[in-house]
């Protein structure tokens, strides 16, 4: 008994494939899974950077400010800007002797 399910045999002067189990539900399911896997792999290769960025950071661009008074929003913006401004003056000077 052979473990092969497909046998290549000469049919009418051509090489063909005699697949008797092609209507088996397991073969159909495996074919569908293979096709879906191939499609998902292609999509992943084409759009990997944008897909992983969405998973990492979500669809939001920043912290939610819903329900926060405008004065607190402005204070938060000033704190963020001051933190950026403070970092601008910190440079390390290294001298080699």
UniProtKB/Swiss-Prot annotation:
Q: Which InterPro entries match?
A: Flu_M2
Q: What GO terms fall under cellular component here? A: host cell plasma membrane; membrane; virion membrane
- List residues in topological domain: Intravirion: 44-97
According to the record, the protein's activity is controlled as follows:
The M2 protein from most influenza A strains is inhibited by amantadine and rimantadine, resulting in viral uncoating incapacity. Emergence of amantadine-resistant variants is usually rapid.
GO MF annotation terms:
monoatomic ion channel activity; proton transmembrane transporter activity
Membrane-crossing residue ranges in chain numbering: 23-43
Biased segments, Basic and acidic residues type: 71-80
| GO BP of this protein | protein complex oligomerization; symbiont genome entry into host cell via pore formation in plasma membrane; symbiont-mediated suppression of host autophagy
What membrane topology does this protein have? Answer: Single-pass type III membrane protein
* Keyword Disulfide bond assigned: yes
Q: Which coarse location class applies to the principal site listed for this UniProt protein?
A: virion
Site-annotated residues for Seems to be involved in pH gating? 41
Keyword match Transmembrane:
yes
Virion surface side: which ranges? 1-22
Organism superkingdom: Viruses
Give the function comment from the record.
Answer: Forms a proton-selective ion channel that is necessary for the efficient release of the viral genome during virus entry. After attaching to the cell surface, the virion enters the cell by endocytosis. Acidification of the endosome triggers M2 ion channel activity.
About its domains, the entry says: Cytoplasmic tail plays an important role in virion assembly and morphogenesis.
Whom does it interact with, and what assembly results? Homotetramer; composed of two disulfide-linked dimers held together by non-covalent interactions. May interact with matrix protein 1.
Further remark: When the channel is activated, one or more imidazole moieties of His-37 probably become bi-protonated.
Regarding protein family, the annotation reads: Belongs to the influenza viruses matrix protein M2 family.
- Name the UniProt record assigns to this protein: Matrix protein 2
Where is the organism placed in the taxonomic lineage, from the top? Viruses, Riboviria, Orthornavirae, Negarnaviricota, Polyploviricotina
